[in-house]
Amino acid sequence: MATVPTRSGSPRQLTTKQTGDAWEVQARRWLEGKGLRFVAANVNERGGEIDLIMREGQTTVFVEVRYRRSALYGGAAASVTRSKQHKLLQTARLWLARHNGSFDTVDCRFDVVAFTGNEVEWIKDAFNDHS
């Protein structure tokens, strides 16, 4: 788990949420550097959450951000299970409906930005509503 120095100079452990938030900020900056535009972060819809919503041209990009210290158990990308994909699809469907859209009317895709150790992997169109 990442650490941050306290005022006294001794490190304290970050919570899982703080660590996740920090990697989401890193992913946002990295994607913006690749030309995507930020729309929203930590979008909650009926119990599901989407880490980032970005735009690439006319495409709405729903982004799941994952971090693992090592690839020992498959790395960060491998942690996006079918169950997690289903929850992301449902959350995106609800978000689109709230914004007067649907998978039929809005060009969108689901990407994963996976940080494993110091490596970053951007998996465009990692899964879709037909998976």
Swiss-Prot record:
Residues 1-20 are annotated as: Disordered. InterPro entries: Restrct_endonuc-II-like, tRNA_endonuc-like_dom_sf, UPF0102_YraN-like. Pfam families: UPF0102. Residues 1-19 have a biased composition (Polar residues). One of its GO terms (molecular function) is nucleic acid binding. Belongs to the UPF0102 family. This is UPF0102 protein YraN. It comes from Escherichia fergusonii (strain ATCC 35469 / DSM 13698 / CCUG 18766 / IAM 14443 / JCM 21226 / LMG 7866 / NBRC 102419 / NCTC 12128 / CDC 0568-73).
